[in-house]
């Protein structure tokens, strides 16, 4: 992990998402904050490369294996946690399997937003993850347009050393 204090950043880009009251507000805020943090750990160059790959190829297939590994690890951890809390092993397996059905392995940020397909930031409510993912389709152009304009004034070296400055709100 890079030390991201006192580094060159672009001017702030704000992107607003729609929150639906059917979702847990704390979980929605957590997932959005994790997406923001992930974006702000990208250089302009990394963002551009990841976006180009996503536009050209869609979701990267290697991201599926990373997500599956994260889900398996979380399932094992959940079974252990429930077993240690006093459940039988069989009951813990059943409860953990039910819990896992509600969870998605989270890219931070989503691949559509320039995320690395191998970077999984944990699990979270899959309905919220799906909502955020679908909203990116209509919001990523805001970021792309500003980065494209900024690119004109940055050298390649500057793009490799200047970080995003994105604020995700709802």
Segments (PLM) and residue ranges:
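Nuclease and nuclease-like effector domains acting on nucleic acids or nucleotide cofactors
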Residues: 1-105, 109-170
């Amino acid at each position: 992990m890079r030390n991201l204090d006192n580094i060159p950043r672009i001017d702030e880009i704000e992107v607003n998402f729609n929150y639906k009251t059917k979702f847990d507000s704390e979980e929605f805020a957590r997932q959005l904050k994790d997406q923001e943090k992930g974006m702000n750990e990208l250089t302009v160059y990394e963002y551009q490369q990841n976006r180009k790959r996503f536009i050209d190829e869609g979701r990267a297939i290697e991201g599926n294996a990373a997500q599956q590994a994260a889900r398996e690890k979380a399932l094992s951890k959940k079974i252990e946690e429930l077993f240690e809390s006093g459940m039988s092993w069989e009951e813990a397996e059943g409860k953990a399997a039910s819990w896992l059905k509600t969870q998605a392995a989270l890219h931070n940020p989503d691949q559509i937003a320039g995320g690395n397909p191998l970077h999984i930031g944990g699990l979270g409510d899959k309905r919220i993850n799906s909502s955020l993912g679908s909203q990116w389709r209509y919001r990523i152009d805001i970021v792309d347009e500003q980065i494209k304009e900024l690119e004109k004034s940055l050298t390649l070296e500057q793009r490799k050393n200047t970080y995003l400055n994105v604020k995700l709100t709802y």
